[in-house]
Design a protein with these regions (language model features):
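Proteins with a high burden of low-complexity, intrinsically disordered sequence enriched in S/T/G/P/A and R
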Residues: 1-3, 10, 146, 164-165
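AMP-binding/adenylate-forming catalytic core of the ANL superfamily
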Residues: 9, 14, 19-20, 29-30, ...
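Acidic/polar alpha-helix N-cap and adjacent early helical turns
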Residues: 156-165
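Active-site glycine/GP-rich loop and adjacent strand/helix microenvironment
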Residues: 2-4, 19-24
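A structured beta-alpha segment of the ubiquitous adenosine-cofactor-binding alpha/beta core
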Residues: 36
Length: 165
């Protein structure tokens, strides 16, 4: 069990949690621990007030120039910036690297942070292949009832590359 606002894997247990996948023992074994905890595959945190905040999918991976990169890792780095309210990363096609990260950022109220500021923030702190090639500022996220619909972010106008070839 983690402390308030610490990120971790969301796991659920209780009489209302399903007992397994119909006719799929392997999927059931992957989803449920031996003592009945269901692993959602989501990363989240629990506030002091008891509210769960969704941060991303554990399996949301990009393949950048042959390197496996967790979108959540890049998001966590940019979420640590004092002027970033929320960030989301999706992979977009790239002729040179196959796929590159595109960063979507909602700035905190009153923030004037620029794309260039975010690139400077990341250089020398995270690996170059993890630095977003595109940055889009956004205030209105495409949402389901509970999560950002990342697949819809891929349809946004990314603008010009801000880093790399």
């Amino acid at each position: 069990v983690l402390g308030p606002d610490e990120k971790g894997l969301i796991e659920i247990k209780g009489k209302h949690v399903f007992s397994g996948y119909l006719n799929d023992k392997k999927a059931t074994e992957n989803a449920l621990s031996s003592d009945g905890w269901f692993s959602s595959g989501d990363i989240g945190s629990l506030s002091k007030e008891g509210h769960i905040r969704f941060h991303g999918r554990l399996k949301d991976m990009l393949k950048v120039g042959g390197e496996n990169v967790a979108a959540l890792e890049i998001e966590a780095y940019f979420d640590s910036h004092e002027e970033v309210l929320i960030s989301q990363v999706v992979g977009v096609d790239d002729d040179h690297l196959g796929e590159v990260p595109a960063l979507f950022v909602e700035r905190k109220p009153g923030s004037k942070i620029s794309k260039e500021d975010l690139i400077v923030f990341s250089k020398g702190q995270i690996s170059n292949f993890k630095i977003p090639r595109y940055i889009v500022f956004i205030d209105d996220w495409p949402m389901s009832s509970t999560k950002v619909q990342k697949f819809k972010l891929k349809n946004f106008d990314l603008g010009e590359k801000v880093f790399g070839k």
